[in-house]
């Protein structure tokens, strides 16, 4: 059998060259396709690191970002409070109170029907025994018992006892520092002492001597 070795060698060489050329072309084509994909897969692009301060990172659930922002703001506020002086803190607290809605603000005004304390009273001094002959008896509302000027004040608790009538000491079995004034609105009693007076004892004491005092006591 005759073999054409020359042509056989040439054909095999050309086949290998064609296969190598096709393989190199496909490799280059795959490389051109893969490079852009690899760039897209890298976060931040080639040669740059991912920014950690993004509002919505790619690997974080968007529903959790709002809570993280609130926590960061609270931490910043705490740091600012620790660095600020007491005067600045008071000023900032006042500004926050002004920004509160009206229903959330604490009402500093007194509610209606708030009891007030008498700070000063002017009365005409008349002895209690002068009411003994009064036709009204224990319900005496004689004009010399009326007060001509009553100033009520809720900010002062000091009584002006010099202008009031002192009860005679012989009316009481117990020596209590009691004083009273009789006005058109009724008879008012108080004690010039810092110690608390028993209300029940005071009421019983006044009821025993109601006949010698103006106004209805019991």
Curated annotation (Swiss-Prot):
Domain of life: Eukaryota
GO BP annotations, alphabetical order: cell fate specification; nervous system development; Notch signaling pathway; positive regulation of Notch signaling pathway; sensory organ development
Pfam families: ESM4
Positions of region (Disordered): 1-30, 64-86, 137-164
Compositional bias (Low complexity): 1-25, 147-163
InterPro entries for this protein: Malpha/m4/m2 (IPR029686)
UniProt keyword Nuclease, yes or no: no
Keyword tags: Developmental protein, Differentiation, Neurogenesis, Notch signaling pathway
Result for mutant: residue 212 to E: In strain: NVIII-m13
Annotated consequence of substituting residue 47 to C: In strain: NVIII-9
Function: Part of the Notch signaling pathway.
Protein name as catalogued: Enhancer of split M2 protein
The encoding gene: E(spl)m2-BFM
